[in-house]
């Protein structure tokens, strides 16, 4: 049996669930009476979602639908970074919604500092865009997980590689 236990803190999302959510948004837009004739387009590219529509009101409706469908598929709302609304040709508006993935160095340092300050028997180390947390007791790791869930970070945190 291992003498130390560990887990990784990451910020990631299931790409296939996001694809499914965007497909549902597109189907909803085609089916909803108030959005049917707006020529709204929603496309998922590598690191963002591009939305183009007739008005800001319609854009807000698309945001609402996207948030609902993402929530139903267990995707955090924190993965969406709504960019500024740009006017496009012909009284249209467009917006790029960036997808957040990975933990920045600043947030990783905050997490590491919180763990060091509050939990003396637990070690945290920053490894790229993840934080590895290790301890001799699984119970200590579970307490750390509960404490981190109480914090409100600007990214969605997941706990992986629990060993």
Curated annotation (Swiss-Prot):
Cellular compartments per GO CC = cytosol
A Pfam family: DUF520
Does the record carry Nucleotide-binding as a key word? Answer: yes
Q: Which domain of life is it from?
A: Bacteria
Which InterPro entries does its entry note? DUF520 (IPR007551), UPF0234-like_C (IPR035571), UPF0234_N (IPR035570), YajQ-like_sf (IPR036183)
Q: Which GO terms describe its molecular function?
A: nucleotide binding
Keyword field? Nucleotide-binding
Would the keyword Transferase be found if you checked this record's keyword annotation?
no
What does this protein's UniProt record list under function? Nucleotide-binding protein.
What family does this chain come from, according to its entry? Belongs to the YajQ family.
Official protein name in the record: Nucleotide-binding protein Npun_R4736
Organism encoding this protein: Nostoc punctiforme (strain ATCC 29133 / PCC 73102)
